C-alpha cells in the first residue's frame, strides 16, 4: 500500500483525480447524488445533494426510513430526518428511529424499527443533471396493500415526489398518511385547502397535490443533527375515511440560499 502510494505520487498525470458525483448502491437500497464535490474545509459550500433510500432485507443497522429523501443545499437542509441520538435516549424508537422520525409513509409501520424490510429501488436515470428512481415500499407497513414512491430531481433544485398507497382496510378520517421533515426551525407558512396545498419556508417552497381532500399541518420535532436540535414537520392527513391516497409533492430549492 505504501509503495503504491509513492508510485501514484511519482506518476505523471493530472494533479487531481475527478471524483464521481452520483452513484447507486443496490446492496443498501440507496442512491447518492451531488451537483459537485467541494473540499471538506470549504467555508461556504454551494453544492446540492440528494440522498434517497429504500432499504434492503440484508441490513444490520436500520431504522424505519424506507423511502427517506434527504436534500441538502450548501449548509442548509431542505428535507431532513430526526437523526440518531444515543441509542438509549428517551423516545429513541418513537421520535427518531421509527417512521415518525423520517419523511415516509406513516400508517402502521413494521415494528421494531430495527427489523429490515425488503423494499426495492429501480433507478430510471442518474447522471450529472439529476436523477429519477422508483421504490416499492409496501413491505415496510403492516396495513399497506401497495405503497410506491417515485423521486425525480434536477441540478436546478426541483424535486418531484410521487406517492401512492392503498390499504387492506380503510383508515379513519384524520389519519396521518405522509410527513416531511423540513430544514426549518421556525414555523413554515401553509396555505390551501382540500386537494391543493402550498408550503413555504426560508430557501424552499413545497406544492402538495392530492387525489382527495387532505389536511396539511405542522409541528415542531426534535432532532439529533445540529443546533437548535429542532425542526418543523409537515403532516398530511386524510379528511375522510380512506382506502388509500395519491400525493404529488414538488419541492423547489432556492439554490442561492445555502446557509
Predicted regions mapped to residue ranges:
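Extended polysaccharide-engagement surfaces of secreted carbohydrate-active enzymes
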Residues: 1-259
Amino acid at each position: 500500500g505504501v509503495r503504491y502510494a509513492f508510485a501514484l505520487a511519482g506518476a505523471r498525470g493530472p494533479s487531481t483525480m475527478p471524483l464521481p458525483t452520483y452513484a447507486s448502491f443496490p446492496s443498501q437500497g440507496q442512491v447518492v447524488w451531488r451537483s459537485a464535490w467541494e473540499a471538506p474545509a470549504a467555508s461556504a459550500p454551494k453544492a446540492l445533494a440528494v440522498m434517497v433510500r429504500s432499504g434492503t432485507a440484508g441490513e444490520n443497522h436500520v431504522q424505519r426510513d424506507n423511502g427517506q429523501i434527504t436534500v441538502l443545499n450548501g449548509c442548509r437542509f431542505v428535507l431532513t430526518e430526526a437523526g440518531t441520538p444515543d441509542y438509549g435516549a428517551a423516545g429513541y424508537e418513537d421520535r427518531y428511529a421509527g417512521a415518525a422520525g423520517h419523511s415516509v409513509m406513516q400508517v402502521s409501520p413494521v415494528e421494531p424499527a430495527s427489523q429490515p424490510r425488503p423494499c426495492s429501488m429501480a433507478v430510471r436515470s442518474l447522471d450529472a443533471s439529476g436523477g429519477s428512481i422508483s421504490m416499492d415500499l409496501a413491505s415496510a407497513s403492516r396495513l399497506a396493500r401497495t405503497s410506491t414512491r417515485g423521486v425525480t430531481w434536477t441540478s436546478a433544485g426541483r424535486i418531484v415526489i410521487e406517492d401512492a398507497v392503498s390499504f387492506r382496510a380503510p383508515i379513519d378520517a384524520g389519519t396521518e398518511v405522509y410527513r416531511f421533515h423540513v430544514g426549518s426551525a421556525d414555523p413554515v407558512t401553509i396555505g390551501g385547502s382540500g386537494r391543493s396545498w402550498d408550503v413555504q419556508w426560508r430557501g424552499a417552497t413545497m406544492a402538495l397535490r392530492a387525489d382527495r381532500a387532505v389536511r396539511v399541518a405542522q409541528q415542531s420535532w426534535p432532532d439529533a443533527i445540529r443546533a437548535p436540535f429542532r425542526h418543523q414537520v409537515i403532516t398530511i392527513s386524510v379528511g375522510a375515511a380512506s382506502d388509500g391516497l395519491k400525493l404529488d409533492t414538488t419541492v423547489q430549492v432556492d439554490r442561492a440560499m445555502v446557509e
